[in-house]
Amino acid sequence: MDAAAWDKKYEETELVWGAPPNELLVEYATALPHGQALDLACGEGRNALWLATRGWEVTGIDYSAVAIEKARTIAARSPRSVLDRLDYRCGDVTVAEYASRNGQGYDLALLLYLHLPAPQRTLVVNRAINSLKPDGIPMILGHDRSNIDYGVGGPKDPEILYTPEELMQEFQGRLEFEIAGNPHRHTETGIAVDALVIGRKSGVGNAKNG
């Protein structure tokens, strides 16, 4: 889908993905000390807003100008202290500037349900890793390729889906993996099969802008 198609999707529904944050993000990040976070394909900002309410400073980037405007409108209902921690930007995550607000890199990068052809996915994940501080955490979550046959919802094009094993093989050496698997998600129409990888940036050195 191009930006115009995403704009149309966000215009037609009040909240495309709902208001609550992603359950796996909440489960994992609740125990983390707050810092700088990057949310790629942030949509209407449900995850970015949740992080900001917990003290994180969050940069959210999305292709859809409509989604970003909705994210800003929703955030405006929050206390000033929360609103000031949010920086929403409209842009294509394959080329957009990732620089953190303090210029020192991110502690956490979210790539949640960001489905791209493999070459673009590799580019974006590498850029996200580059933007992290040493020991920073990328969280990659999406529809597993097996969901086409064994789950419900999500894209039906296998070229934009992936498995945890593929991600681990591709990014070994760049990440030290903490969690990898296929969580099952209950939906109104059945069970969806997801792919989840969480790791830490390997090696030392300064974070880059991506």
Spell out what each predicted region is.
Residues T122-P134:
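A short glycine-rich, Lys/Arg-flanked "PGG" loop and its adjoining helix->strand segment in the class I
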